[in-house]
Each structure stands twice: as structure tokens, then as C-alpha cells.
Regions:
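N-terminal nucleotide-binding beta1-loop-alpha1 segment
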Residues: 1-17
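A short, N-terminal amphipathic alpha-helix
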Residues: 29-46, 59-61, 65-66
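Short phosphate-binding loop-to-helix
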Residues: 52-117
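Short, conserved phosphate/pyrophosphate- and ester-handling motifs at nucleotide-, phospho-/glycolipid
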Residues: 201
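Short beta-strand/turn micro-motifs composed of small residues
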Residues: 9, 50-52
Length: 245
């Protein structure tokens, strides 16, 4: 069985161009994502799925220096880009990672991978808790069958979304996909407040850099943020964007 992690990233975000190369905790954000994935067991290959545009050359060079595989394809059609990764790597299971999600709860993510290995008769795998939702810190896992069905449901009605968001078509057709859901009750602490952990804006990058500086280390668990936010509140932490006037 071959398991890959597929990082989808490009440098032409209108909200925060080249954000994957911006420093988070003293390292490029994409490097933190790669290091997170290397903490997980059973991942055989990490792949960057990016575009053929010259604007992504720096991103590709950094990822190559980290020793991960590269696939370059369409900027706007993720069915083609992700399909190209499937052809190149021939995986049994894919862990899709968004390039703007630099934080992972390692225990929760590992539980999803372990479930995908232990329960092979499903298209997709995820984790849920009756308490807080922190989707950007968790992962999903998809078998090849998930992508086959996902591309098909998008092709059946491409008007529901753009090809860069074909997952919308998947969400509109949940009955077409079999799914195993890991019980995250004992993994996701009930005291966690639901919040956004992805980085789409410079302001968010500045905020999380301040949090990491306050912690003194890079977080790998949701509980790290609980402690950090509690400590920052107790010392009367105040912060504003450095670019604010």
C-alpha cells in the first residue's frame, strides 16, 4: 500500500501572494507543512502539486531542497493537477493538504491515517468530535476511488463550481462516497474553541507569529494553542498588526 501526502499550493493568491514562502515561526510556511507531515507515520511520499507558471519556481526550488516530489500542472483546474499527481505517483491513499494550513494536530491526523489502513473498504476518511471543530488542524484521507468519483461528479455538472473547487461538487453528492469517520472525542479537547487555523491574509500570519513567539515553540497539537491563548490572556497580552497605523 502506498500513501502519499499531496500539498496543493501556488504563489498567485490575490489575498496574500507568495504566502507559502512567508516566514512562520522563523521558517517558510511550506517548510513547516513538510516538517509536520514528516512527523506522521506510514506516509511514503510527499508531493507538491503546483502550477507551471514561473511565479511558482521559487516554491518548487524550496520544496526540491526539502527532498519532496514535484508535480506542475494547471493553475485553475485542480482535477487536472490532482489527476496528474495520481498518474505520477500511483498511490493507494492520498492525504490532501492545503498549502495555507500550516498547523496539524499530530495525534488526530495519525488517527485518520491509521483508520484508512485498518478499514480499506471506504472512499474517504476523516475525524470528528462532539466538541469543537478545528478542520484546518486535521486531515482527511482519500482512496483512488474517491478521486475517480469526485472527478466524475464534477464533470456531470461543472456549473456548480469552478474546477479549482471541485470538492464543492463532492459535498453536494455525499451519497456517492463511502466515508469512515474517526471518533475524535478523546483527541480533540472539549475546551478547544472553534477557530480558523489556516492563513489566508498577512494579518493572520502576523497573529500566529506572535502566538508562536509567545509559546516559544512550534505547535503540533490543539492543546498547544489552548495553553498559549490562556498564557497570553493571563499576562495581559496585546497585539496589533505591524502594518496598522
Amino acid at each position: 500500500m502506498k500513501i502519499i501526502a499531496m500539498i496543493t499550493a501556488r504563489s498567485t493568491s490575490s489575498r496574500f501572494p507568495r504566502k507559502h514562502l512567508a516566514l512562520l515561526g522563523g521558517k517558510p510556511m511550506i517548510q513547516n507543512i513538510i516538517e509536520n507531515l514528516r512527523l506522521l507515520k506510514h506516509i511514503d511520499e510527499i508531493v507538491l502539486a503546483t502550477t507551471t507558471k514561473d511565479t511558482d519556481n521559487d516554491l518548487v526550488e524550496l520544496c526540491m531542497s526539502e527532498g519532496i516530489s514535484i508535480f506542475r500542472g494547471s493553475e485553475d483546474d485542480l482535477t487536472l493537477r490532482h489527476g496528474g499527481v495520481l498518474v505520477m505517483c500511483n498511490p493507494d491513499i492520498v492525504i490532501p493538504i492545503s498549502g495555507d494550513c500550516p498547523f496539524m494536530d499530530i495525534d488526530g491526523c495519525q488517527a485518520v491515517i491509521d483508520a484508512a489502513i485498518a478499514h480499506p473498504d471506504y472512499d474517504g476518511y476523516s475525524i470528528q468530535s462532539p466538541y469543537a471543530r478545528c478542520p484546518e488542524m486535521m486531515i482527511a484521507a482519500h482512496r483512488r476511488s474517491w478521486f475517480t468519483k469526485a472527478f466524475q461528479v464534477y464533470e456531470e455538472d461543472p456549473t456548480v463550481c469552478g474546477a479549482d473547487q471541485y470538492n464543492v461538487a463532492v459535498n453536494l453528492n455525499p451519497d456517492r462516497f463511502s466515508k469512515y469517520v474517526v471518533d475524535g472525542t478523546d483527541i480533540i479537547d472539549r475546551t478547544v474553541t472553534s477557530m480558523k487555523f489556516s492563513i489566508d491574509w498577512r494579518l493572520e500570519m502576523e497573529f500566529f507569529n506572535a502566538v508562536i513567539e509567545g509559546m516559544g515553540y512550534y505547535p503540533h497539537h490543539i492543546t498547544d494553542f489552548i495553553k498559549a491563548f490562556t498564557d497570553m490572556r493571563n499576562i495581559g497580552f496585546t497585539w496589533r498588526d505591524k502594518g496598522a497605523s
